[in-house]
C-alpha cells in the first residue's frame, strides 16, 4: 500500500492525464489534459465539492461516497476518494462542474492484500459517450488507479450487467468464476 507521512489538507494532484473530448458537431475525439486528484478527508473545501457533486449528480453512488467521505473513511487507513477533473490547478477549491468521475477505494484486509474498488462513477452528463462531451472516463480512472497502487491487486464487485462486466474485462480485470460478480486485477510482474 501507499504510505505517506505527509499530511495534506487539500486535494492533491496524483497525476496529469488525458481524456478524450468529442469535437463540436462530430463524433471524432480530441485529447484534452485532465488531472487525477486525491481528495483530502480533512478539507472542508473537498467536503463541499463532494456535497455539491452529490446534489447535482443525484446518483446513489455519489451519495454513498459523500457519506463515506464525511464519516466512514476517516476511520479507515488507506481509504480514499479520487476524482478525474478537467481542472488543472488550484486544487484547494475543486470545481464540481469540472469533475468527470469519482472513485472510492478501501483497503482489502491487511496491508499487502491489495485494494477494494468500492465505487466508480462518471458524471451523469458523460454516461453515454455518444451524448457526452468526454469519453473513456472510466478507463482513464482505472489506469490512474493502477499506476497509483502500482504492484497492488485491485478487487471489485461488478453490477450484474454484461456491458459493465465487459468493460472491466477490457481493462485487465478477471472474473473469478462464471456467474460471479467478483473481478480482480492482478498486476503483471516484471
Predicted regions and their residues:
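Non-catalytic substrate-recognition and accessory regions of acyl/acetyltransferase enzymes
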Residues: 5-132, 136-140, 144-190
Amino acid at each position: 500500500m501507499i504510505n505517506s507521512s505527509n499530511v495534506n489538507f487539500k486535494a492533491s494532484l496524483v497525476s496529469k492525464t488525458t481524456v478524450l473530448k468529442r469535437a463540436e458537431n462530430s463524433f471524432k475525439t480530441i485529447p484534452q489534459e485532465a488531472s487525477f486528484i486525491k481528495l483530502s478527508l480533512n478539507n472542508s473545501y473537498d467536503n463541499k465539492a463532494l456535497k455539491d457533486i452529490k446534489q447535482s449528480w443525484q446518483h446513489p453512488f455519489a451519495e454513498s461516497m459523500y457519506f463515506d467521505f464525511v464519516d466512514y473513511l476517516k476511520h479507515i487507513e488507506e481509504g480514499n476518494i479520487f476524482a478525474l477533473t478537467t481542472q488543472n490547478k488550484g486544487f484547494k477549491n475543486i470545481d464540481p462542474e469540472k469533475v468527470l468521475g469519482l472513485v472510492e477505494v478501501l483497503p482489502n484486509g491487511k496491508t499487502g492484500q491489495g485494494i477494494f474498488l468500492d465505487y466508480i462513477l462518471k458524471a451523469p452528463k458523460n454516461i453515454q459517450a455518444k451524448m457526452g462531451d468526454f469519453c473513456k472516463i472510466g478507463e482513464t480512472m482505472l489506469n490512474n488507479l493502477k499506476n497509483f497502487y502500482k504492484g497492488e491487486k485491485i478487487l471489485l464487485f461488478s453490477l450484474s450487467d454484461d456491458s459493465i462486466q465487459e468493460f472491466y474485462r477490457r481493462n485487465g480485470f478477471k472474473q473469478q468464476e462464471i456467474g460471479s460478480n467478483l473481478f480482480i486485477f492482478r498486476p503483471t510482474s516484471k
